[in-house]
From Swiss-Prot:
Similarity field: Belongs to the UPF0060 family.
Protein name: UPF0060 membrane protein azo2656
HAMAP family (alphabetical): UPF0060
InterPro entries (alphabetical): UPF0060
Species this protein is from: Azoarcus sp. (strain BH72)
Primary localization: membrane
Subcellular location: Cell inner membrane
Alphabetized NCBIfam families for the sequence: PRK02237.1
TM regions (residue ranges): 4-24, 33-53, 61-81, 87-107
Key words, A-Z: Cell inner membrane, Cell membrane, Membrane, Transmembrane, Transmembrane helix
Length: 110
């Protein structure tokens, strides 16, 4: 799988997970409708399915995915929550992305 396809798949996976967790949050913390749980469940199912599309070992996928999740969560903070990330938020998320790149794209010995 090419690096770009891997990154795009991780981004889609992160959005699916965040939406799947955000909707119950809205229901519980912001008096949202219980109907929010239906798309939340679908989003979390999509998240789990997307994780299976990666060709690498599951442990490596989970470890690398964490870096992308951090980055997308900071974007969510800005775009959905309306909170501008600090320089430390951005720096930390970029470090996490670097960790993902090392885990996923480093040369592997035979």
């Amino acid at each position: 799988m090419t690096e770009l396809k891997t990154l795009l798949l991780f981004l889609a996976t992160a959005v699916a997970e965040i939406v799947g967790c955000y909707l119950p949050y809205r229901w519980l913390r912001e008096d949202g409708s219980a109907w929010l749980l239906l798309p939340a469940a679908a989003s979390l199912a999509l998240f789990a399915w997307l994780l299976t599309l990666h060709p690498a070992a599951s442990g490596r996928i989970y470890a690398a995915y964490g870096g992308v999740y951090v980055f997308v969560a900071v974007l969510w903070l800005w775009g959905v929550d309306g909170v501008r990330p600090t320089v430390w938020d951005i720096t930390g998320s970029l470090i996490a992305l670097c960790g993902m790149a090392v885990i996923m794209f480093a040369p592997r010995g035979a």
